[in-house]
Regions:
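Alpha-helical transmembrane segments in multi-pass membrane proteins
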Residues: 1-27, 76
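Membrane interface segments of multi-pass transport proteins and intramembrane proteases
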Residues: 2-6, 38-42, 101-111
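Interfacial loop-to-helix junctions that mark the boundaries of transmembrane helices
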Residues: 3-13, 40-46, 137
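Membrane-interface helix caps and helix-loop-helix hairpins in membrane proteins
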Residues: 5, 63-73
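Hydrophobic core of alpha-helical transmembrane segments in multi-pass integral membrane proteins
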Residues: 15-28, 49-65
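Structural signal for the C-terminal ends of transmembrane alpha-helices
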Residues: 24-34, 157-160
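Cytosolic, membrane-interface loops and tails of multi-pass inner-membrane proteins
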Residues: 33-36, 97
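Transmembrane helix-loop-helix hairpins at the membrane interface
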Residues: 58-60, 71-182
Length: 182
């Protein structure tokens, strides 16, 4: 946790894209923004599902704050995986991209944003360093299909639930569970 300011800056820079898109869409869509971007929680089952996922995140946080020595890293990871990763990736891939493709046939509406989602993970898979030809081949053969399918499942979850918050919380919980390995 001694280099958290640098880690925060590193996480914040890529998050500027979703943040700018969020502000741009909010300004352009005005009153239609929450509905069109699936930012509402309506109905009992949506709220219960969101509470269950949030409880999972906070339960994991409480556990890690008790058993882990570096509590600052646990709290930073909570913020990082919920805001930068969970919300950032879901908003860009599941809201912005699908909004642009809303009139496209379902295979296009599912494949294009989720191939983009998969490609967002290429640099993470290479340790944020230079991407070599071998890295690219390994990513294309080992990771691309799984990440694309998981993205499609997140999108299906968003469309069936009618809210972006359930995929955001599920994505955050899945990625945040890495704190167990610290």
């Amino acid at each position: 946790s001694e280099d958290l300011p640098a880690a925060f800056r590193q996480g914040m820079i890529p998050f500027l894209i979703p943040l700018c898109l969020f502000l741009l869409f909010a300004a352009l869509l005005k009153r239609d923004f929450p509905e069109r971007m699936y930012l509402t929680l309506r109905g009992r089952w949506q709220r219960i599902a969101a509470l269950v996922l949030a409880a999972g995140i906070f339960g994991l946080t409480a556990y890690c704050l008790i058993v882990k020595e570096d509590r600052t890293a646990v709290l930073y990871s909570l913020f990082y995986y919920v805001v930068f990763i969970g919300f950032g990736e879901e908003f860009v891939c599941r809201d912005v991209c699908t909004d642009f493709l809303r009139n496209a046939a379902w295979p296009v509406r599912y494949l294009v944003p989720n191939l983009c989602f998969a490609m967002l993970h290429l640099f993470e898979r290479t340790g944020w360093g230079t991407v070599t030809g071998a890295d690219l081949v390994r990513f294309l053969t080992a990771d691309l299909a799984g990440l694309t399918v998981s993205g499609c499942l997140f999108q299906l979850f968003k469309e069936r639930s009618g809210t972006i918050w359930l995929p955001v919380l599920l994505h955050a919980l899945m990625d945040y569970s890495v704190v167990l390995t610290y």
